[in-house]
From Swiss-Prot:
InterPro entries tied to this protein: ZIP (IPR003689), Zn_transptr_ZupT (IPR023498)
Binding positions (Zn(2+)): E139, H164, E168
Protein name: Zinc transporter ZupT
Domain of life: Bacteria
Annotated source species: Stenotrophomonas maltophilia (strain R551-3)
NCBIfam families found in the cross-reference section: PRK04201.1 (NF003243)
Amino acid sequence: MLHIPPENVWIALAVTLAAGLATAIGSLLVLFSRRPNPRLLAFGLAFAGGAMVYVSLSEILNKSIASFALAYGERTGFTYGTLAFLLGVIVIVLIDHFIPNPHDSLDKQDPAFRENSREYLKRVALLTSIAITAHNFPEGLATFFATLESPSVGMPLAFAIAIHNIPEGIAIAVPVYFATQNKFYAFSASLLSGLAEPVGAALGYWLLSGSLSHATFGWVFGLIAGVMVFLALDELLPAAKRYAKGHETVYGLVAGMGTLAISLVLFKW
């Protein structure tokens, strides 16, 4: 079993908490501005998607393979790392199948934005909150374990997830605010959803802390990489394209990848 210094656990948990709290920023943008800028949302979503794809394929998947290689040898390690990645994709596909896409309610043309449909708004608010909270659990695990094993990987990943959490905060706050006309309720709903990330991280560590090994990290990192890549390709990039008026999606995608590439190089130094 690997020994993890207690201070590393607290650092990883703090980073995960900071990423989760970004949902509250999204709610504040709704409550204290006229309307979210759709082109900025498009760029931000694509930026987060590019960052998550890059760090998942260039760092997290490689760490899965390296961890398995330390446990079982190079050839077996590569095989297990690939299987863990594919298993992560399958897991998030199943979650996505049963829980609706949390970005659907951001559309200003959706009936949820009509002030005379309070009951519909309440239903949208509830479903959106549940959806985003469920998606935040694996994101919390990803941030926590990536930071726990390597802050140089965890910090950029947390940054990407934080950016992606801002529009999720908007997705929660908008229907809650229109349904209740209460800013506190809208802010609280977004905040509580974001707190699912550190809660998921704490639960994951509690379950796995007694059996942390190279093989355990291999499975965790492989699953994380699969989950993050699927979320980026299935949710973030399509949502970005939905709000884009021009080339914001491509610019955001390239900027996200470039920013993560540079930050990872800087962390190496």
